């Protein structure tokens, strides 16, 4: 639960769009949640990052921003905390350094993942496994919005704790309260 009383309503107002949209599944929808709109708004991004600071576990050495949406958030949280950030690609580069994670070496360090939205956790799961294989300790992901169904823990299979700033239920409640 966020300490910023209007954050859910403000994000919902900016990101929930109405119109005709084709979803990733190919289905048609009249409503769409465009998460990049809060990340592109410097004031909303700062408010989300401030909330995330309080959710970081003690002993975090590095902030791992997941491509693409976690990168601007991790950068802002890094700026607020002074902790270094690294940027975790979906796939390692095939040229240059051929790295999956750009930034400081992760071996022997505690990495807290930073993500914008978690629904099924696929990208977070892949990043967790890759970082652990590189020697990192990864136990927590802090996300702006947890859209997984209530009561489900999509990352329990990899032993990852999800610490959200907001949940889908909180966004829906903010919308209903303002309607």
Swiss-Prot record:
Keywords: Glycosyltransferase, Magnesium, Pyrimidine biosynthesis, Transferase. SUPFAM superfamilies: PRTase-like (SSF53271). HAMAP family: PyrE. Orotate binds at residues 119, 147. Its cofactor is Mg(2+). Belongs to the purine/pyrimidine phosphoribosyltransferase family. PyrE subfamily. It comes from the Bacteria. It catalyses: orotidine 5'-phosphate + diphosphate = orotate + 5-phospho-alpha-D-ribose 1-diphosphate. The gene is pyrE. This is Orotate phosphoribosyltransferase.
